[in-house]
Amino acid sequence: MSSVPIDSVQAAQQVVSTKIKDKSWIMPTDPAEFLQQIAYQSQLLACLHWLGEFQILACVPLSGSVPIKDVADLAGVPVSQLAHVIRFMATAGFMKEPRRGEVAHTPQSAAFVTDPSFLDAGIFLAQVSARSARKMAQNSAISTLMGGDGANNGSDFDNGELLKSTSESPRVQREVTAYLHYVVNEVSDTANLLAQLDWRKLGSSSVVEIRADRIYPASLVLTELHSTPRFTVQTFQEDSVEQGTAVTTTATTSSSFISKSSEEPSPKRIKPGITYQKRSLGSPQVVTDATMYVMRLERPHSTSVQRSILDEGQIVSELRAHLGVLKHNSNATLILIGPLLPEAGAIDAKAEMVVRFRDLSLNQLTSEREMEVGELVDIIGDVQDESGCLVVVNKLYSRTSSTVALEVRYELYNYRKG
């Protein structure tokens, strides 16, 4: 039997690779193609895991090619199996066979060698995340039999166990960190979403950004667009600062506000006119004359698998801390902004796919879930006093991410009835 010419093999691989990149292949409407895509992606993950476990990628030089047999001997795997894996992965643009019996890196596969964190993420995806996903039906059935509602699926790793394994194993910690960064992470769209607000009507009013990013608060971006409002950047103070107080610094001395950050702000990040403060979570808001309070809900970047925003109790604590301020200043607005599960069709399909994937992964790994927009609206409405309550008066969605902004005001009960 005559062998297939190598140029024909490469041509076939190019056709498949091009088809994979096409949106109709990624999101097929035909049931058979849908199943084929699932099977193909599953095999890609299995092969990536296999290549990683036997450290085969590191055995291939970053430039030039090497005989597949030499790589197989070095890694201690069968030549035939390695050849089949390489030829399959090549259909996705991951490695290539430039000449029959030789293997070389493509830019995609080379990145997994020059930056091992890509491989760390892939291994965690294959060994932990995908395994938990496959056991979702089984775990839900067990949860139901034990008297649960099946929502908390009895995952293999509850949050405590996963945190423990992460802290005890440097390898697991490295893999979890890479997985969170490359697979389930998305870029925050906070600054762009805030820019959609009508800043001109604020004039020289005061704006407070609560729980600002320590390194790059959104206020720095907003001052570039709108120089008139006076900005105050508040970060949660460290335990060493007395509970219930605020420590204020000016822009010229504000480098001290990054007390536990590994990175100090550069001079370019310091803007005249921005005041930096530290506050305790849930302590009374010390800036009482602001027109707008912007509270960021997302957690700081973490090395553990957990929901993207603060816990309900933490959110309620901050809402109550601002209840009096909003009550006594009818012009004041509180903006809650962060990653939330959107209402169906509210954001771009690709962005919704990412956030829905993150939600399911979180549930399968820890039995937790991301918070939905409707849940947060209900939480806000439950914060009240004898005269009125907090209400959501507007919602802003980012079309390209799960970032949502809710505009909140204090409303008197008799006003609502009227």
Curated annotation (Swiss-Prot):
Gene3D superfamilies (UniProt xref): Winged helix-like DNA-binding domain superfamily/Winged helix DNA-binding domain (1.10.10.10)
Subcellular location as annotated: Nucleus
Disulfides per UniProt: none
GO cellular component: nucleus
One GO MF term: DNA binding
Disordered: region residues: 244-272
Biased composition (Low complexity): 245-260
Swiss-Prot/TrEMBL keywords: DNA-binding, Nucleus, Transcription, Transcription regulation
Function: Transcription factor that, with ptaR2 and ptaR3, coregulates the expression of the gene cluster that mediates the biosynthesis of pestheic acid, a diphenyl ether which is a biosynthetic precursor of the unique chloropupukeananes.
Protein name: Pestheic acid cluster transcriptional regulator 1
Gene: ptaR1
